A protein has these predicted regions:
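Repeat-mediated protein-protein interaction surfaces in helical alpha-solenoids
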Residues: 27-43, 72-76
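Generic helix N-cap/helix-start motif at coil->alpha-helix transitions
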Residues: 47-55
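A cross-kingdom marker for long, charged
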Residues: 45, 206-233
């Protein structure tokens, strides 16, 4: 089943035409739009609460090892945020799933494999959007903050989060071509969401835990701050 799905996704990589392009209406026009230089930026009307709810569900599935649920959540998140065609959404979701599965084992994970999968993810976004970023660099920055979060996750709970925040800000700054300082608050709130998530994992991943609401709220603040930071003056 794994090989069949992988082949189907690869078969779709060469398709072009209307179904292979980023939608310029619907969800994309409400959430993401080109600004000035053409960089995809969060729309002013981005629903930070909705995106946070979707990503929080993704985190819950990841830490509970519920990979089918993770894939379903990834499809909803990617479709909602990027407005890709359904084919491209499924392909991007598969690349994200494979990256996280390769990253998940501790301590013996496959960081290089995770980077390759994320490079495929970002290459797909670049193909669909036409944006001038380097998929390999975006993947490197992405997996770097995964690495720093894992170090923090398995160290003292009160250890310094500045390196993690710096890595998140670096990814945002690269993706949206803004100064690190402009997106630092968004990075700080995302790091806070991870702190709540780590506490939730340590406590046993209880679906009734109030920590889920706390990390969802921090993610919402992060997305709201990010959307505000990358808008033109």
């Amino acid at each position: 089943m794994h090989d069949q799905l992988e082949q189907a996704i690869q078969d779709g990589s060469g398709r072009r035409g209307r179904t292979g392009r980023v939608a310029r209406s619907g969800l994309l026009s409400r959430v993401w739009r080109p600004e000035g230089s053409g960089v995809l930026k969060p729309h002013r009307s981005l629903d930070a609460q909705r995106v946070a709810q979707l990503e929080c569900a993704l985190w819950v599935a990841y830490y509970r090892g519920e990979w089918i649920r993770f894939l379903r959540a990834a499809v909803v998140v990617i479709r909602h945020v990027f407005g890709l065609s359904w084919l491209s959404t499924v392909r991007a979701s598969w690349f994200l799933l494979r990256a996280t599965q390769l990253w998940a084992p501790y301590p013996d994970n496959d960081a290089a494999g995770a980077r390759r999968a994320m490079e495929r993810f970002y290459r797909l976004l670049k193909q669909q959007s036409g944006e001038p970023f380097d998929p390999a660099e975006a993947a490197r920055l992405e997996v770097e903050w995964w690495h720093l979060h894992r170090i923090h996750q398995h160290s003292n709970a009160d250890s310094d989060e500045r390196a993690l925040v710096d890595a998140l800000a670096a990814l945002y700054a690269y993706a949206f071509r803004v100064p690190d300082t402009a997106v630092r608050m968004a990075a700080e709130q995302r790091a806070l969401a991870m702190r709540y998530c780590d506490q939730w994992v340590s406590a046993g991943c209880d679906l009734q835990s109030s920590l889920i609401a706390q990390k969802r709220a921090a993610l919402a603040r992060s997305y709201a701050s990010l959307a505000a930071a990358v808008q033109p003056a």
